[in-house]
Amino acid sequence: MCFSIHKLVGDVTEASQVFVSSQMFGLFSKKPEVCNVLGDSITLRLTAEQTEGKYSVAEFATPGGVGQPPHTHDWNENYVVLEGELNLNIGGHPTIIATGDSYLVKAGTVHAPTPNGDFCRYVMIGQPGGVESVFKSLKANEKELGDMNKVVEIVTQAGVKIAG
């Protein structure tokens, strides 16, 4: 599979093509942590600790009807779709990313990733690293995730701001 990666360098986005197979993602860590939270299966492929804080990599397997509410945060996220289609809902506008494509969501941008269809598998690369703290916090509090006020409290403490 070939996809483009868009990297933010200063105020300029540089694009490059990367050839990758889905098996490659298994090489990132021998026993990656999996966080099954709010309908998402999130595999933490690389953490900030493993990359000296430079970035984090998480792989999502998300069924249709599941998704994140509109939110912002202080880090960039690059989404790479491996299977299906992802709607990033940028600023409330549908933004469909197809298999093999990528999209850079800059820090502070309102977005709400949801599958565009029955299922989507994608990789999210957060820069700088540390986004995994959101997923680990949700996993650690999974018994309280039926209370959406508690979910908002948990993600807010991890640096996510729910929009609206």
Q: Each predicted region: which residue ranges?
A:
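Conserved short histidine dyad/triad with adjacent acidic residue
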Residues: 43-44, 56-72
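Ligand-binding loop in jelly-roll beta-barrel domains
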Residues: 51, 87, 107-132
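Glycine- and acidic-residue-biased ligand/ion/polar-headgroup-sensing regions
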Residues: 76-77, 81-86, 91
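Short glycine/proline-enriched turns and hinge-like loops at secondary-structure junctions
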Residues: 54-55, 72-74, 115-118
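A hydrophobic, small-residue-rich beta->alpha segment in the mid-to-C-terminal subdomain
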Residues: 120-121, 135-141
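Short acidic-glycine-tyrosine-enriched beta hairpin
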Residues: 26, 92-110
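A short, N-terminal "cap"/entry segment at the start of jelly-roll beta-barrel domains
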Residues: 2-54, 142-164
